[in-house]
């Protein structure tokens, strides 16, 4: 049947609801702990975007949420109504203005837009949402639907701040006066150092029209003042990290307040790399102060129990409740401020968990501020705003009257408070960390809600009058979102029913109260929740307004004392009673006239009657009670309720008891209970009704009347003996007719006995004659439980549990002594004749002496026996406690007191350790005088007659213990080392004590050869004597000492990480590690502690396996986590148990996927196995990686590891094999591998292959025969080549060895010469000029300048301008902005400025730092890689940096680095000159440069020439080594070097000015020249003359004489002059002028005459030469081995230089301050710009010092020394310089066969040099920072030393030439700059320009 339309609609609606319901609660939070069945909280979740801000509309209750890239509108119950997208946007933080306004040179990327400010503008019905994108622009959204009304973004006022931190900005929206419409926005924001772009605090206009051009314009702005406050750039340059973070803002009366966090500039050091301190400030402004004259800020915080809380987290402005207002002495409409502070002043981003909730009154804050303003206007103190420039300005006295409403003047502002405004601490949370706060007044009581880091809301009641002295009580804690911190915007709903709490991903609606969870009045009112009271008749905990008729008396309880109290009479009834009348009395109940019922829980209910204020009702019937009490023992407690007929609710209860007497089975338990029970002793029952007892005398009500057995003497019964047992009793009943008599029950295990008993009277009873027995002889006496019954099963009470003791005499008493020492109450004695223990009547004794009993005082046993001695050896000195075990060793101590001897030595028994008959312990006396070394032990019982004397079966030996060794012989000072002391007889005696260094060594065990003990802590390092006391013997050995060493320390663990399963190898570096034999590493994590052993290699190194931290509770996250504790168990060294210094991390174990779903993977042979997974490479710092082993079966495979997979080259296996992966302690099997062998071929295939193979074989044989013939020829060639290669290798090695030895000798001679003459350092002035102005010998700054007086005055004024930092910076920046300002100009200006400021080095350093800071900023803003910074000289700053180091490192060069540099230069020069050098090409036999290597064999001989001393012809001739292939000029150079050894180059003759004269006798003298008529010419090639050409012989005498002018020279001089310029242009390279000169060939070819000059090799550019000399050149690359030989020869000198440069302290010189200072500056800049890439920092330092200074000096030693550098030396130094640069680089050098030879040459050395550089940079970083005072003093000293080196007037004149050239641009720049205008810099410069113009 079809459904009607209406039904169909209803059905569809129901279905829709069913579908929606699950979704409505899908993302709900958790109910509170301890809660009842309350439904979960409503939530809104944002999975994609982090939430940041939340506001609630005060009329509609709608919720607006700001997030990353989104704005959401939610209903009051958190249903999503609208979402508005704000991002991501294409942006770059460096783009100012944003890309939407102006194209940006920086790369754009997808950028999140973080909502930082969310405010409701009720008057304009819009939402103001400000984000982080596009420099912090804001959007206006319509409240109804989030429609975007406007987004002002085109003016600078629209950009609030680009900082991305969400919780750092705060604003207050001030509505305009009614009718005028214009509102104001006060906004505070951090600026991230961009003070030129953003004010930190400002007041903006909010226009009615969102597109209005004046939107966000400053409320007031003129030329000097505006509604804004900026952080000065000087503050930021001193404290780059300085910023102000705005936590909370509010309006109170006519003021706007901000709570801020800012860097504490007084506690934070400007150069501190890490430690930043913060302080909280409260900032106040007048609402109507557009000029911000009213700005005041005060430190704010609170203190509790001596702990300071200074980091503000959140605040909330509220009104106090009536009670709190009264306690504070305030009116109820005054404002109070609740704040949350974290402890201390560190870690703004992650503050400590310990936090405090504090209370401030606005009245007190205003009063403090007023007092401060008044004191300042009285002229007291300073402005004291630490972060403003005018903080040191004094206050100005003024007669103004300062009242509460004062809003400031244009002086005495802005003002800072010096005293902290302290709040009242209300509540301290030490565990969870408070993060947010909100508060409100509920019915006159103040309730505070505090959010925590763990996602909870704490509800706190504030009551300053608490009797316990606690001003606040946290009465409840509920979870909003577990584990996620509550963010700042904690907001109440308009009706105060709910609290909206926000975490990063969720908004939760938390009810302000959850009274319904409390189920009783006591719980409800005991919770102290001020919202909750007890609604009496409804029996529910609720708000007052939720309780019906709550205002009527006693219907609503608001206090614990008002809870309903109920009593009942009687309080109990027997289960057998029915309908007992009960009277109930109730207190604190309302009017019950509507009627009540009595309800016994849910069992029964009865009507009640109200009479005289009492309630009367009846108990249930016995039939109804029976099921209630069944199985409940003797009582059942039930709740008796009063149930209101009005509400149907049970509203009061009292405990009521039903008791049951009949369960008691004994008289005593019956009458001793809590209830009125009676015992019927004749019926043996317990009843509540006394009438149930038939006999009156049988009724018992008290325990004294109960029948019971009384304690009498103990009952001892020998087994097998018939005897009666009499018992004492009380109130024994006389059995009545028909009742049976008494019996005794003995509960003997295995054979219980029932014996008839006779009742004598009511107090006496006898168990009749009977014998008793028990099985076995292993028990000598057996206590047996005894019961007395009558009438079959009526048990008489035995309250004392009286027992009978059965005993057997022979059991366990085989000897006389054991028999007689038995308890005398056992009638056992020793039957002498039968030699057994028995009862007397069982012994056939004919005399009394035949049976002995202990009661006979003189009894003693015969035949004592010694069975065992312990110990069996002891020292002669005595004192050994000898334990003698045996039989019949006396019965009393007196029997043996004097009867024990060891041989002749008395042994004194110790009474306390004597065991009758069985054991004697005695102390042996001194046996020193006894010669015998062993003796028998004798025991005499009373006397030594034969029957009473015992001798030991073994002899006791007297020994002399000794020791001769201790192992280990050393250990830590803290002790705890197990040592073994070796010797002989060390187990002697009964007691041993060892002391080491006078302190006891804790004994463990010993044997005859060793004692083990644990060393005590030592007093100090060094040897400690060992003393062993064995009883009275004291053993010493002066040769054996134990050495205490300093405790081991741990310096480093490498790597500083492991995985969850541990097991990875850790190299531990420290000191004194070998002092501990078995060190162990320990780790504690998640409550579980584990240890692993370590292997010690030496005192500084050991290797440990990391302990596993695997546990079920906790595992490390992917980014790693520190263990709770990590340390080392090293004997007793406590300091290493927990290492605080290490940052050791544990990463999760690798996770590998199974090989396949089934676990079995099939694989072909030789196919790689790929194992996929994650966490395979932990993201640990450093180069260490996790080492994997993959086993196929038991065979390992070759592995390649990446982040997500292991690639395993499977071994050559077939079949099934288990795959196992191991890494450290981690082991996992991803499955089994099935490897198939290649499939077998079919028969036809085999036949086919066989036929084809045979044919192929014939072909192969033919080919092989042909190949064999060819290969025989090739073999011969190969062997010949191999022989040549071997010879070549041997030759290179030998050549290198010989050359080095020879060079060392030469250098040694040179060093000796230097010791006398000294290194020819240039003076400071020349050195500086060569670096600053290379190639200019006679620079104007070296000369005095003659000028007119007015010019001098102008230049002086210009000099003063240059010392104004702002002018100089503007000057430099303006020049650099000009296109015509060339690179050369930049270098020139930098050098001129440094010379002009030579006497102002501190100022110059400040300017340089600012320029470098700008350069870094510019570099980072451009697309250049940060590593390119300082790489090239493209700015004034870079050249200034070179000059700065030039000035400051001169002393270091002279004292330290100069010597190895000069030695390297000399070594290169000497080594080069040992072999031929081509005078034309500059190529040499020995070279480091491939380009300057002669690549063919040159035959030459070494000659020794005896040179006549040019200064004194009569002095001895100087022997000089030369080569016969040297040109005449080369020979002259060598002769001059020898003759003028030690003379600076500039002070000796030049080769061109001297002639070489060969003297062959007294008169025969020949002038030798490079070219003369004898010069050989061949096919247009003219060869220079050499010594061989002139046939100069070894030992020839030569002289250097002043140049003679000859006809030949005259004729050729013009040719030389003309050819010079052209040839120079061919060979010059870009270098310093001196090096240009040095690269000019020594002889210039005559190009005009058509002939070409050559010396050793013809120029490679000529083809005829290339073909013709092929034979002599062979393969030219073979000669590259000479590079290697030369490099090996010079290696030591290169190493020495590099080591000196890269050492922080060398040759007595400390590291120059300039280096440390500049490196620290670069680190600060990197920190400022958040550059954490170590490579970038390294590169900056390398570009700054090695590249800019050292490379220049290495390539150009003539800058430092007075020397001449020739072409080949220059080429070699360039190779060294390149190696130096490569060593400073961080990039990997990938080398191949095509790499340049100079790179290959030092390829193996560079990694080592790189490690030196890294260590050098690290050592510098570790050095303490240089204080500003020390640096200032150092720079002042440098200025003083070199004050007059340059003419400053000349330098100023040179600089002024640039002013002339760019006058207009510089003046315009000064006019544009605000600070320049303030300092009137333009007018001052114009004055200089005018004066200079007049003079010209």
From Swiss-Prot:
* Signal peptide stretch: 1-26
Q: How does it sit in the membrane?
A: Single-pass type I membrane protein
Tell me any Pfam family this protein matches. TIG
Q: Where in the cell is it found?
A: Cell membrane
Question: Quick one: where is this thing mainly located?
Answer: membrane
Tissue expression, per UniProt?
A: Detected in fetal brain, lung, liver and kidney.
Gene3D superfamilies on file: GTPase Activation - p120gap, domain 1 (1.10.506.10), Immunoglobulins (2.60.40.10), YVTN repeat-like/Quinoprotein amine dehydrogenase (2.130.10.10)
- Coiled-coil parts of chain: 1264-1317
The record lists glycosylation at 77, 660, 672, 701, 1043, 1187, 1212
Q: List the disulfide bonds.
A: 95-104, 130-138, 286-407, 302-358, 376-395, 515-532, 521-563, 524-541, 535-547, 598-617
Ranges facing Cytoplasmic side:
1266-1896
Q: Mind listing the UniProt keywords for this protein, alphabetically?
A: Cell membrane, Coiled coil, Disease variant, Disulfide bond, Glycoprotein, Intellectual disability, Membrane, Repeat, Signal, Transmembrane, Transmembrane helix
Q: Residues in domain Sema? A: 27-512
Q: Which residues cross the membrane?
A: 1245-1265
Asked whether the keyword Nuclease is assigned, the reply is no
> What molecular function terms (GO) are annotated for this protein?
semaphorin receptor activity
Gene Ontology CC annotations of this record: cytosol; extracellular exosome; glutamatergic synapse; nucleoplasm; plasma membrane; semaphorin receptor complex
Q: Which InterPro entries match?
A: Ig-like_fold, Ig_E-set, IPT_dom, Plexin, Plexin-A1_Sema, Plexin_cytoplasmic_RasGAP_dom, Plexin_RBD, Plexin_repeat
Q: Which segments does the topology annotation call Extracellular?
A: 27-1244
Which BP terms in the Gene Ontology apply to this protein?
A: dichotomous subdivision of terminal units involved in salivary gland branching; gonadotrophin-releasing hormone neuronal migration to the hypothalamus; neuron projection extension; neuron projection guidance; olfactory nerve formation; regulation of cell migration; regulation of smooth muscle cell migration; semaphorin-plexin signaling pathway
Q: Give the protein's function.
A: Coreceptor for SEMA3A, SEMA3C, SEMA3F and SEMA6D. Necessary for signaling by class 3 semaphorins and subsequent remodeling of the cytoskeleton. Plays a role in axon guidance, invasive growth and cell migration. Class 3 semaphorins bind to a complex composed of a neuropilin and a plexin. The plexin modulates the affinity of the complex for specific semaphorins, and its cytoplasmic domain is required for the activation of down-stream signaling events in the cytoplasm.
Please describe the quaternary structure of this protein: Interacts directly with NRP1 and NRP2. Interacts with PLXN1B. Interacts with FARP2, RND1 and KDR/VEGFR2. Binding of SEMA3A leads to dissociation of FARP2. Interacts with CRMP1, DPYSL2/CRMP2, DPYSL3/CRMP3 and DPYSL4/CRMP4. Interacts (via TIG domains) with TREM2; the interaction mediates SEMA6D binding and signaling through TYROBP.
Q: Which PANTHER family does this entry report, sorted A to Z? A: PLEXIN (PTHR22625), PLEXIN-A1 (PTHR22625:SF35)
Q: Tell me the protein family, please.
A: Belongs to the plexin family.
According to UniProt, the name of this protein is: Plexin-A1
Species of origin: Homo sapiens (Human)
- Name of the coding gene: PLXNA1
């Amino acid at each position: 049947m079809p459904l009607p339309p209406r039904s169909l609609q209803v059905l569809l609606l129901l279905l829709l609801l069913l579908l929606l319901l699950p979704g409505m609660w899908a993302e709900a939070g958790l109910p509170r702990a301890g809660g009842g069945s309350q439904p979960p909280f409503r939530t809104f979740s944002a999975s994609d975007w982090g939430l940041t801000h939340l506001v609630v509309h005060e009329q509609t209750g709608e919720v607006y949420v700001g997030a990353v890239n989104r704005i959401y509108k939610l209903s009051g119950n958190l249903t999503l109504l609208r979402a508005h997208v704000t991002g991501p946007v294409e942006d770059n933080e460096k783009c100012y203005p944003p890309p939407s306004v102006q194209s940006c040179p920086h790369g754009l990327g997808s950028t999140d837009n973080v909502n930082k400010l969310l405010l409701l503008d009720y008057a304009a019905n819009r939402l103001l949402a400000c984000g982080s994108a596009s420099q912090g622009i804001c959007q206006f959204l319509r409240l109804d639907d989030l429609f975007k009304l406007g987004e002002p973004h085109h003016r600078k006022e629209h950009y609030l701040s680009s900082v991305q931190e969400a919780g750092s900005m705060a604003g207050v929206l001030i509505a305009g006066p009614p009718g005028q419409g214009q509102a104001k926005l006060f906004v505070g924001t951090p600026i991230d150092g961009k003070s030129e772009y953003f004010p930190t605090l400002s007041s903006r206009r909010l226009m009615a029209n969102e597109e209005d051009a004046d939107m966000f314009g400053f409320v007031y702005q003129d030329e000097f003042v505006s509604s804004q406050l900026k952080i000065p750039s000087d503050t930021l340059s001193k404290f780059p990290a300085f910023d102000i973070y705005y936590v909370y803002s509010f309006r109170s009366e006519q003021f706007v307040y901000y709570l801020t966090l800012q860097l504490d500039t007084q506690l934070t050091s400007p150069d501190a790399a890490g430690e930043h301190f913060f302080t909280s400030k409260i900032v106040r402004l007048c609402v109507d102060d557009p000029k911000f004259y009213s700005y005041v800020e005060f430190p704010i915080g609170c203190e509790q129990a001596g702990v300071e809380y200074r980091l503000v987290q959140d605040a909330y402005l509220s009104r106090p409740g009536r009670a709190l207002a009264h306690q504070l002495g305030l009116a109820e409409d005054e404002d109070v401020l609740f704040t949350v502070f974290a402890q201390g002043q560190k870690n703004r981003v992650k503050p400590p968990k310990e936090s405090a909730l504090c209370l401030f009154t606005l009245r007190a804050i205003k009063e403090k501020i007023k007092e401060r303003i008044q004191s300042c206007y009285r002229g007291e103190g300073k402005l004291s705003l630490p972060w403003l420039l005018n903080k040191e300005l004094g206050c100005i006295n003024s007669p103004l009257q300062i009242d509460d409403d004062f809003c400031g003047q244009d002086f005495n502002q802005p003002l800072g408070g010096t005293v902290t405004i302290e709040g009242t601490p209300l509540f301290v949370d030490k565990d969870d960390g408070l993060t947010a706060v909100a508060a409100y007044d509920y019915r006159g009581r103040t309730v505070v809600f505090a959010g925590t880091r763990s996602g909870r809301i704490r509800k706190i009641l504030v009551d300053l009058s608490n009797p316990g002295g606690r001003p606040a009580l946290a009465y409840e804690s509920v979870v909003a979102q577990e584990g996620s911190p509550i963010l700042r915007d904690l907001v109440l709903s308009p009706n105060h029913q709910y609290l909206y709490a926000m975490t990063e991903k969720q908004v939760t609606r938390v009810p302000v109260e959850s009274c319904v969870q409390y189920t009783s009045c006591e719980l409800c009112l005991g919770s102290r929740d001020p919202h909750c009271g007890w609604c009496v008749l409804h029996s529910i905990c609720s708000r007052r307004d939720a309780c019906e008729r709550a205002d009527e008396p006693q219907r609503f309880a608001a206090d614990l004392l008002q809870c309903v109290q109920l009593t009942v009479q009687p309080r109990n009834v027997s289960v057998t009673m029915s309908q007992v009348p009960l009277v109930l009395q109730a207190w604190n109940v309302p009017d019950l006239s509507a009627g009540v019922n009595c309800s016994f829980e849910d069992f029964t209910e009865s009507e009640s009657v109200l009479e005289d204020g009492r309630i009367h009702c009846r108990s249930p019937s016995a039939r109804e009670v029976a099921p209630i009490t069944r199985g409940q023992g003797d009582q059942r407690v039930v709740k008796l309720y009063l149930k209101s007929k009005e509400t149907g609710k049970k509203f009061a209860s009292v405990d009521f008891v039903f008791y049951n007497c009949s369960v008691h089975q004994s008289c005593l338990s019956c009458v001793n209970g809590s209830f009125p029970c009676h015992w019927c002793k004749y019926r043996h029952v317990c009843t509540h009704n006394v009438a149930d007892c038939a006999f009156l005398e049988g009724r018992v009500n008290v325990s004294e009347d109960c029948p019971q057995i009384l304690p009498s003497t103990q009952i001892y019964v020998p087994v097998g003996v018939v005897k009666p047992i009499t018992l004492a009793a009380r109130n024994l009943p006389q059995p009545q007719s028909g009742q049976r008599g008494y019996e005794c029950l003995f509960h003997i295990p295995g054979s219980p006995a029932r014996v008839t008993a006779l009742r004598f009277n009511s107090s006496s009873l006898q168990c009749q004659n009977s014998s008793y027995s028990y099985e076995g002889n292993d028990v000598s006496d057996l206590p047996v439980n005894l019961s007395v019954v009558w009438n079959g099963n009526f048990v008489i009470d035995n309250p004392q549990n009286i027992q009978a003791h059965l005993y057997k005499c022979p059991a366990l008493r085989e000897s006389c002594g054991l028999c007689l020492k038995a308890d005398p109450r056992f009638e056992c004695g020793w039957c002498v004749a039968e030699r057994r223990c028995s009862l007397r009547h069982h012994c056939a004794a004919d005399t009394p002496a035949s049976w002995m009993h202990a009661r006979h005082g003189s009894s003693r046993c015969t035949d004592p026996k010694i069975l065992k001695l312990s110990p069996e050896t002891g020292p002669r000195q005595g004192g050994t406690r000898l334990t003698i075990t045996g039989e019949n060793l006396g019965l009393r101590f007196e029997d043996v007191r004097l009867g024990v001897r060891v041989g002749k030595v008395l042994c004194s028994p110790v009474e306390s350790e004597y065991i009758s008959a069985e054991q004697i312990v005695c102390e042996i006396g001194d046996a020193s005088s006894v010669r015998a070394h062993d003796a028998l032990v004798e025991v005499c019982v009373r006397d030594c007659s034969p029957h009473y004397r015992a001798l030991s079966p073994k002899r006791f030996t007297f020994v002399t213990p000794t020791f001769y060794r201790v192992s280990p012989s050393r250990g830590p000072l803290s002790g705890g080392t197990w040592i073994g002391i070796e010797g002989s007889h060390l187990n002697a005696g009964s007691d041993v004590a060892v002391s080491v260094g006078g302190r006891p060594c804790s004994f463990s065990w010993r044997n005859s050869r060793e004692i083990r003990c644990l060393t005590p802590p030592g007093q100090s390092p060094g040897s400690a004597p060992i003393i062993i006391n064995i009883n009275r013997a004291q053993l010493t050995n002066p040769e054996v000492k134990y050495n205490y060493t300093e405790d081991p320390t741990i310096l480093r663990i490498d790597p500083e990480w492991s995985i969850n399963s541990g097991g990875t190898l850790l190299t531990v570096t420290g000191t004194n590690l070998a002092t501990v034999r078995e060190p162990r590493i320990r780790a504690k994590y998640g409550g579980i502690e584990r240890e692993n052993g370590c292997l010690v290699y030496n005192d500084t190194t050991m290797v440990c396996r990391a302990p596993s931290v695997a546990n079920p509770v906790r595992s490390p996250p992917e980014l790693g986590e520190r263990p709770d504790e990590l340390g080392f168990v090293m004997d007793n060294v406590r300091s290493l148990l927990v290492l605080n210094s290490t940052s050791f991390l544990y990463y999760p174990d690798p996770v590998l996927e199974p090989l396949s779903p089934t676990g079995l993977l099939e694989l072909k042979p030789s196919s790689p196995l790929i194992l996929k997974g994650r966490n395979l490479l932990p993201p640990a710092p450093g180069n260490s990686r996790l080492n994997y082993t993959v086993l196929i079966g038991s065979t390992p495979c070759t592995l390649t590891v990446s982040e997500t997979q292991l690639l395993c080259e499977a071994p050559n296996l077939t079949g099934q094999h288990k795959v196992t992966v191991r890494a450290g302690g981690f082991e996992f099997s991803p499955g089994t591998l099935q490897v198939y062998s290649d499939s077998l071929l079919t028969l036809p295939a085999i036949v086919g292959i066989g036929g084809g193979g045979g044919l192929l074989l014939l072909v192969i044989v033919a080919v092989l025969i042909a190949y064999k013939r060819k290969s025989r020829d090739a073999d011969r060639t190969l062997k010949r080549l191999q022989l040549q290669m071997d010879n070549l290798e041997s030759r290179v090695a030998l050549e290198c060895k010989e050359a080095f030895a020879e060079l060392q000798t030469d250098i040694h001679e040179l060093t000796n010469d230097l010791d006398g003459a000294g290194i020819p350092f240039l003076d400071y002035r020349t050195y500086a000029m060569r670096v600053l102005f290379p190639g200019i010998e006679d620079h104007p700054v070296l000369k005095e300048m003659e000028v007119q007086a007015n010019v001098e005055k102008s230049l002086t004024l210009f000099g003063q301008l240059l010392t104004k930092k702002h002018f100089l910076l503007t000057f430099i920046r303006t020049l650099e902005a000009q296109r015509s300002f060339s690179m050369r100009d930049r270098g020139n200006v930098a050098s001129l400025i440094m010379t002009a400021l030579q006497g102002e080095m501190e100022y110059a350093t400040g300017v340089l730092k600012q320029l470098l800071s700008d350069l870094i900023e510019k570099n980072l803003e451009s697309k250049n890689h940060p590593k390119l910074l300082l790489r090239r000289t493209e700015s004034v700053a870079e050249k200034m940096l070179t000059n700065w180091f030039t000035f400051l490192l001169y002393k270091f060069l002279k004292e330290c680095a100069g010597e190895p540099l000069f030695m390297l230069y000399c070594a290169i020069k000497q080594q080069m000159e040992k072999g031929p050098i081509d005078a034309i090409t500059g190529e040499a036999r020995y070279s480091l440069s491939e380009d300057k290597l002669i690549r063919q064999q040159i035959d030459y001989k070494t000659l020794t020439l005896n040179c006549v001393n040019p200064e004194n012809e009569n002095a001895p001739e100087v022997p000089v080594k030369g080569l016969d292939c040297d040109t005449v000029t080369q020979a002259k150079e060598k002769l001059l070097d020898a003759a003028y050894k030690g003379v600076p180059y500039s002070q000796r003759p030049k080769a061109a000015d001297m002639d070489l004269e060969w003297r062959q006798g007294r008169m025969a003298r020949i002038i030798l020249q490079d070219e003369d008529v004898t010069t050989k010419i061949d096919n247009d090639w003219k060869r220079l003359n050499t010594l061989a050409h002139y046939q100069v012989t070894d030992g020839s005498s030569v002289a250097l004489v002043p140049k003679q002018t000859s006809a030949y020279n005259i004729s050729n001089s013009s040719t030389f002059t003309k050819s010079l310029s052209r040839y120079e242009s061919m060979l010059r390279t870009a270098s310093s002028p001196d090096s240009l000169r040095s690269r000019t060939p020594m002889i210039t070819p005559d190009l005009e005459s058509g002939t070409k000059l050559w010396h050793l090799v013809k120029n490679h550019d000529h083809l005829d030469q290339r073909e013709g000399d092929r034979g002599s050149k062979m393969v030219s690359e073979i000669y590259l081995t000479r590079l290697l030989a030369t490099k090996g020869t010079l290696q030591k000198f290169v190493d020495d230089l590099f080591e000196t440069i890269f050492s922080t302290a060398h040759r007595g010189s400390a590291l120059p301050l300039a280096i440390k200072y500049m490196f620290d500056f670069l680190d600060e800049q990197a920190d400022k710009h958040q550059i954490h890439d170590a490579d970038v920092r390294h590169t900056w330092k390398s570009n700054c010092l090695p590249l800019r200074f050292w490379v220049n000096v290495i390539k150009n030693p003539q800058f430092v020394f007075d020397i001449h550098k020739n072409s080949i030396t220059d080429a070699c130094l360039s190779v060294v310089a390149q190696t130096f640069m490569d060593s400073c680089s961080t990039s990997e050098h990938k080398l191949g066969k095509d790499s340049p030879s100079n790179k290959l040459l030092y390829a193996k050395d560079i990694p080592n040099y790189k490690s030196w550089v890294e260590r050098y940079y690290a050592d510098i970083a570790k050095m303490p920072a240089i204080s500003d005072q020390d640096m200032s003093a150092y720079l002042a000293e440098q200025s003083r030393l070199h004050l007059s080196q340059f003419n400053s007037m000349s330098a100023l004149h040179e600089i002024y030439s640039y002013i002339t050239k760019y006058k207009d641009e510089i003046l315009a720049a000064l006019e544009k700059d605000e600070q320049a205008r303030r300092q009137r810099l333009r007018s001052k410069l114009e004055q200089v320009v005018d004066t200079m113009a007049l003079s010209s």
